[in-house]
Amino acid sequence: MNSVQVRIADWQQDNAELRRIREAVFIAEQAVPPEQEWDADDAEAVHFLALEGGYPIGTARLLADGQIGRVAVLRDWRGMNVGDALMHAVIAEAERRG
């Protein structure tokens, strides 16, 4: 595995990848109803994508109140510190925003 890169994502521009990951993890694996997975917070949240070799493998979001949520890593990349990389990036951004 190459090093995982985490970047801030754009909800509009990166929507397909963000949705693909969350649908795989929350809707398909965890049986979260779609109407509960997608909410109005998505449009306003700061989203993050974890990428390995340029391929999106994980996501998370940061709400305006500082709440971290929707942390998801695709099954094949679990146990490889992708979640750690996401959380470090989200926390750093939350601290930067105050």
Task: List each model region and its residues.
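A short, internal acetyl-CoA/4′-phosphopantetheine-binding micro-motif in the GNAT/acyltransferase core
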Residues: 71-78, 94
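Short loop/turn motifs at secondary-structure junctions and domain boundaries
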Residues: 38-43
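Short amphipathic alpha-helix that is part of the acyltransferase structural core
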Residues: 1-37, 55
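Short, basic and Ser/Thr-rich N-terminal targeting/leader segments
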Residues: 44, 55-56, 98
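Conserved acetyl-CoA-binding loop-helix of GNAT-fold acetyltransferases
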Residues: 79-92
